[in-house]
Structure formats: C-alpha cells, structure tokens
C-alpha cells in the first residue's frame, strides 16, 4: 500500500481527476480546470490527472492539436503545486506534457503505441498502464472474455515486465484493470476482487462515478454515484490498493482518515 507523505500512515494515494473536455461525463470536472485542480490539492490530493480527450464509451477522437490546447496550459500551472499525471493515448501529447511539468503518463490504451513505450523508458517517468478491450468508440459493444482476470493480468504484466526488462524502475509502474473499458458489470466485479493478481506491481483503481456503480445502485446519472464510489474506495483501502482516481477528493481523503482512526 502506498504511503501518504508526512504522516507515516498508509492508505491509497488519491489522484484527482481533471477532465478538460467538453463532453466529460462528470459535469464539474470540465470547468475551471486549474482552480478545480488547486482545490483538489488543498483537499489532500497526492496527484492530479489531467486529460483532454474523452475516453467515455462511444467517445469520438480529437486532433492532437486540440488535445494539447486543452491540457498543456493546465499541466504547466498545476505542476507547480502538485504532481501531475497526463491522461493521454498520444505520445506527442505525453511528451509535451512531460516537458510542461507532468511526471506520470496515464495511458488508457495500455502502451499499445511503441512510441509511447519508448517515451516512458527515455523519460524515466511514472506510468499507469490500463487495460482496454477495443477503442472508446466501440469498447462497450458486447465485450467478451474467456477468463477476464487471466486475460487482463497477462496483458498488463507483459507490458510492465517489458518496461522492467528495459531498466524502468518497478516502483514507477502502476497497473489499472480498466474498469468500464470494454467490460460488462460482472467483468468489472471479478477484476476488482482479483486485483492482487497484478502484484508485485502497484495497482490503481479508477471507478469513481462510473456506470458500474450506477448499475449496482440504480443511479442513472453521475451525480447520484458518490456513495457507491466511496464504497469502492473503502474496499480499496481494505485490499491495500496503491492509488485511486476520483472526482471527489475531500470525501475520499476523509473516508481514509476515518478508516485509519478506527484501526488505531
């Protein structure tokens, strides 16, 4: 489990989500990117994850230029106050973001692009490798697996092992099973239960306000999914997950504080 700097206690690190996209599924993430990010830092975020391309189911791709216009100014400002992750599938955008101050690449396509893989090696940055079946535009159209846990595990570990074989520090590698990215509800639940299969690498969960929670809780809109998101975070704490990506930083930090206090 990750260690929160300064207090000597262990809990999942909290990564606040900033979606600099006009079609983000969570309304409040796309307004006032810098101000919202700095509020997240004040609320206790350890990382800020900034993305300019929507990867929600059915999302359409955008140009590299448009993606950079959305994210680079925010990365430049926020990286002066907090560690920043760039959420992108494009190696050109990732390189510009690293130059602007980002220190992690969060690639939802799981380093499919060899140039992205090479950039991680050359820069020595932290990286989150996520599993996605298909592409955002079609990934939720009847996804199928023979054994979802084994298939996702093999896919992610092959890439992580290859990074390590090329000299990349293991402590800078996070693996994300990709909840909601080419998975049905049962697939998602199986992957969350089996997250230890991704060890010895650090594990990241990104479940905040996703449709999985809406399906379980009968909450069709994202606004009604905070309680379900916190339930997932409590399970992440119990399972010693290393980092979680969330829209609601303060609520998750408070949750972990209470869980720690109850253990004391």
Question: Model-derived features: where do they sit?
Answer:
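Active-site-adjacent loop and "lid" segments of alpha/beta metabolic enzymes
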Residues: 3, 9, 24-36, 55-83, ...
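Catalytic domains of carbohydrate-active enzymes, especially glycoside hydrolases
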Residues: 36-51
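Phosphate/pyrophosphate-binding loops at sites that engage ATP/ADP/AMP, CoA/4′-phosphopantetheine
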Residues: 41-42, 82-83, 159-172
